[in-house]
């Protein structure tokens, strides 16, 4: 299966999920999950070769730097991962405890990461070498630092979410959806781990060529989207039946 097909399927799953969950934007306890899906869609779209060949050229004319759309997409991934952690913590803690935990362990590291990412992106091959697929840009010191920082942050956030899902799955009523979310988080973590390894071992880059990262990243986005849509349909079905 080509990368373009993977991206198209993932964006289709995300679009369908957002349609199913369209009323959740005004629902306090569901909006974080919906925001996660939307931002993953933005990230996948901006990282796609099509975006690089169109939006990327426009941004180059404005900034003089290549691959700016990919950097924006990666920022969207960080916020998406933060949103899904927020959603998970909301299921496990009361509001005050959740807000404290989120600010200390999620919001603060993510906020620090984004400007540091911009600096490492701007100073290395990330902004100097054009490729339609950013995963195929050869790494130098700064781009390797960029990938390690980005993927390390995402590993931390997704690992935090996975830990919350391990707690949530102890509840028999939540076990099925927790297992699916856990699988999605692991897929995202595998994408990050693959990218870190290829950054540290440049000889592997032409062999992997970004394909494994795309497979795991798209699996993460599609599974989160489908699981969130399914979860919302179950809730609305229960609410509808309880009224009769």
Model-derived regions: residue spans:
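Membrane-helix interface motif
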Residues: 45-57, 119-132, 196-204
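Membrane-interfacial loop-to-transmembrane alpha-helix junctions, especially the N-terminal start
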Residues: 25-38, 101-107, 173-184, 209-216
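Alpha-helical transmembrane segments of polytopic membrane proteins
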Residues: 1-10, 66-79, 139-155, 208-222
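Internal transmembrane alpha-helix with an interfacial aromatic "cap," most often the third helix
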Residues: 17-18, 69-107
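Membrane-proximal first intracellular loop
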Residues: 1-70, 174
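Juxtamembrane/interface segments of multi-pass membrane proteins
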Residues: 59-63, 127-140, 167-176, 201-208
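Membrane-proximal helix-loop-helix units in multi-pass membrane proteins
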Residues: 89-158
């Amino acid at each position: 299966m080509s990368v373009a097909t993977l991206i198209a399927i993932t964006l289709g799953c995300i679009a369908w999920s957002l349609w199913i969950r369209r009323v959740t934007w005004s629902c306090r306890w569901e909006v974080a999950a919906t925001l996660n899906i939307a931002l993953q869609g933005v990230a996948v779209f901006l990282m796609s070769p099509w975006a690089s060949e169109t939006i990327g050229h426009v941004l180059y004319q404005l900034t003089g730097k290549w691959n700016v759309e990919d950097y924006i997409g990666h920022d969207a991934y960080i916020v998406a991962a933060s949103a899904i952690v927020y959603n998970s913590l909301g299921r496990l803690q009361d509001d005050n405890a959740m807000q404290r935990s989120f600010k200390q362990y999620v919001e603060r590291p993510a906020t620090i990461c984004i400007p540091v990412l911009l600096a490492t992106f701007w100073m290395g091959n990330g902004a100097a070498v054009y490729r339609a697929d950013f995963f195929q840009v050869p790494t130098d010191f700064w781009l390797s630092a960029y990938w390690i920082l980005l993927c390390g942050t995402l590993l931390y956030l997704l690992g935090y979410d996975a830990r919350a899902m391990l707690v949530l799955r102890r509840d028999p009523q939540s076990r099925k959806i927790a297992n699916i979310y856990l699988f999605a988080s692991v897929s995202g973590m595998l994408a990050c781990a693959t990218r870190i390894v290829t950054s540290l071992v440049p000889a592997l880059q032409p062999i992997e060529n970004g394909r494994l990262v795309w497979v795991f990243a798209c699996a993460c986005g599609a599974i989160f989207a489908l699981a969130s849509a399914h979860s919302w349909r179950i809730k609305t079905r229960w609410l509808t039946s309880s009224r009769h």
